[in-house]
Swiss-Prot record:
Keywords carried by this UniProt record: Mitochondrion, Ribonucleoprotein, Ribosomal protein
Listed GO CC annotations: mitochondrial large ribosomal subunit
Protein family membership: Belongs to the bacterial ribosomal protein bL19 family.
Organism: Reclinomonas americana
Keyword field contains Ribosomal protein: yes
PROSITE patterns cross-referenced by the UniProt entry: RIBOSOMAL_L19
Record carries keyword Zinc: no
Localisation per UniProt entry: Mitochondrion
Gene Ontology process terms (BP): translation
InterPro entries: Ribosomal_bL19, Ribosomal_bL19_CS, Ribosomal_bL19_sf, Translation_prot_SH3-like_sf
An example Gene Ontology molecular-function term: structural constituent of ribosome
Parts forming coiled coils: none
Protein name as catalogued: Large ribosomal subunit protein bL19m
Amino acid sequence: MLNLIQTLRMEATQKSRHKKTQIQSGDILSITTTQYKNKKRKQNLKGICIGIKKRIGYTTIQLRNFIGGVSQEQSFILESPIINNIEIIGKIKGNTKAKKYYLRTKSPSENKV
């Protein structure tokens, strides 16, 4: 049973398309996605990565940004086919916590990208 779990983990890490990018909590990211509603169009999203959840088959990140004075959080699965490109723009200053959930209580001027 243990060997099966180890082989599944190795296969999942080899399949990861974005394993070259070393994304950490607190990074400012720019993600390009493809939307397939009526037409195929690309959308560029920017935000602060406030959390990363690593599972056996996939990795999920949470982005937070203020758009038009309203806070917005989005979750993305890194292995999803709708994600075209992930670019690390910068890093926020401050605490070295693993999860940046304290940014939810901060003012919009401190969280704006």
